[in-house]
């Protein structure tokens, strides 16, 4: 693993320098997306394979919202809200705990299934769950359909994993 560290470090530095150079020369410009939305600790934007072109924004504190089609809108529909679950060790936590990933089933358009990866406390553990969309509202998750697929005890609060695909 060590022999890959130097080439990877060089690649990362070159990428950072190239991106900075492009911005300095005016070849690219970063602009805020959805400037009127209140977004807290975003971790993923996921587009379901259902042809709807909806963009789901997963946030670390346990909420998943559907981004509005109008980028200037201040409203985003809440798809899933797990913020009442004890995902983080404390409210002011700025670590990796919380909702860490989301993925849609390849046949989401047919079965409405999606998957989330999150942490839980007491005992501290990583969880991968399957859920389904509400039968009455395609813009809402049905948390009563949650099926825990995997739970792994975590001895520490850092570096549990990342996104799921």
Predicted regions mapped to residue ranges:
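Acidic, Gly/Ser/Thr-rich repeat motifs that build Ca2+-stabilized beta-propeller blades
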Residues: 22-165
